[in-house]
């Protein structure tokens, strides 16, 4: 998988201090794109997705990765970065460029990636991410009307019982 190094990352939102998506105070980066795979597989409209409003209510914008990393590092409250909101692995080059830049600045805080994919569907990006320390990935599609589950790796309650997180490095 040949990846280019990106200077910007396209996001639909940035929350400087998030206390919901991980057991540590985090910067939450709302990724910009989704292929609605979860919805297509079970035959429901994308509007039924818990994240659909993110697409319809917020505009995607390119943000310089280096300045975003500096912004994170200047916040003494946060100790992790969480990618989520839509599908981060549709922006693999940008996510990897962010991780590479953050690690290059000497920061080894946890980076958490919420994906609707299963490990076998994103094996190449996972292989590349394993080169960096402290990467956590939440796997599994959103299933409406599913019982949620507490995930001990993330330290939070997930929306669907088929979802789980793994520390991959």
Question: Where do the language-model regions lie?
Answer:
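Canonical Radical SAM [4Fe-4S] cluster-binding loop centered on the CxxxCxxC motif
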Residues: 6-9, 17-62
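Canonical radical SAM enzyme core domain
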Residues: 54-69, 89-131
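A cross-family glycoside hydrolase active-site/sugar-binding cleft signature
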Residues: 30, 84, 112-116, 140
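Charged phosphate-binding loop/patch that engages nucleotide di/tri-phosphates or the phosphate backbone
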Residues: 161-169
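N-terminal "domain-start" segment that seeds a small globular fold
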Residues: 1-15, 137
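Non-cysteine beta-strand/loop elements that form the S-adenosyl-L-methionine
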Residues: 133-144
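Conserved glycine-rich "GG(E/T)P / GGGxP" loop and the immediately following alpha-helix
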Residues: 77-102, 143-155, 167
């Amino acid at each position: 998988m040949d990846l280019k190094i990106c200077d910007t990352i396209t996001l639909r939102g940035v929350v400087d201090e998030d206390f919901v998506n991980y057991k540590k105070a985090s910067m939450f980066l709302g990724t910009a794109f989704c292929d609605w795979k979860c919805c297509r597989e079970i035959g429901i409209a994308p509007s039924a997705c818990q994240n659909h409003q993110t697409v319809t209510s917020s505009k995607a914008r390119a943000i310089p990765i280096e300045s975003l990393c500096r912004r994170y590092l200047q916040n003494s409250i946060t100790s992790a970065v969480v990618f989520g909101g839509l599908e981060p692995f549709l922006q693999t080059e940008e996510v990897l460029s962010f991780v590479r830049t953050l690690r290059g600045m000497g920061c080894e805080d946890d980076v958490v990636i919420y994906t609707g994919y299963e490990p076998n569907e994103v094996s190449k990006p996972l292989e590349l991410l394993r080169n960096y320390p402290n990467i956590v990935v939440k796997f599994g599609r959103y299933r409406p009307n599913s019982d949620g589950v507490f995930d001990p790796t993330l330290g939070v309650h997930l929306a669907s019982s088929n979802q789980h997180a793994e520390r991959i490095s």
